[in-house]
Amino acid sequence: MFPMVTEFMNYGQQTVRAARYIGQGFMITLSHANRLPVTIQYPYEKLITSERFRGRIHFEFDKCIACEVCVRVCPIDLPVVDWKLETHIRKKRLLNYSIDFGICIFCGNCVEYCPTNCLSMTEEYELSTYDRHELNYNQIALGRLPMSIIDDYTIRTILNLPEIKT
């Protein structure tokens, strides 16, 4: 008879323990009910990137002196710089500049070490394409500035979301 009583007591303790665990989980669920949602509806709402965000690289052709510092500091030797030596003025003239963003790791070394500041990081992060060859940007594509998310009236930025007072 005693083993049956102890089994019944163990069953009762396990039931109370299970009810307590369920109650703790339910309390956590209720505590999150008053918070703002974390998920955003991406195509229609976009996050505003931080000031130091490493997006697509912007290139200013007129400032470049073809010193190739960007190629030397790049861990994967990515920027392709074509230049021609002008012998009468003893300076390099830049012919072509291109970066393949399919290979780029967005480390920012080229931007940091550029002596003339002809390279800068933009806030553009939508670089997806159907063909990987479209990710190879030449100096014309690198020279285009992206449209700012803040200026785009068709997209509601995350700062305009209503706040829930708790």
Swiss-Prot record:
Entry keywords, A to Z: 4Fe-4S, Chloroplast, Iron, Iron-sulfur, Membrane, Metal-binding, NAD, NADP, Plastid, Plastoquinone, Quinone, Repeat, Thylakoid, Translocase
Cofactor: binding details: Binds 2 [4Fe-4S] clusters per subunit.
Residue ranges of every copy of the 4Fe-4S ferredoxin-type domain listed in the record: 55-84, 95-124
Bilayer topology term: Peripheral membrane protein
Chief subcellular location: plastid
GO biological process per UniProt: photosynthesis, light reaction
Gene3D superfamilies cross-referenced by the UniProt entry: 3.30.70.3270
Disulfide linkage: none
Keyword Secreted attached: no
Residues annotated for [4Fe-4S] cluster 1 binding in this entry: 64, 67, 70, 114
NCBIfam families, A to Z: ndhI, NuoI, PRK05888.1-3
Similarity comment: family membership: Belongs to the complex I 23 kDa subunit family.
HAMAP family per UniProt: NDH1_NuoI (MF_01351)
Role played: NDH shuttles electrons from NAD(P)H:plastoquinone, via FMN and iron-sulfur (Fe-S) centers, to quinones in the photosynthetic chain and possibly in a chloroplast respiratory chain. The immediate electron acceptor for the enzyme in this species is believed to be plastoquinone. Couples the redox reaction to proton translocation, and thus conserves the redox energy in a proton gradient.
UniProt name for this protein: NAD(P)H-quinone oxidoreductase subunit I, chloroplastic
Gene: ndhI
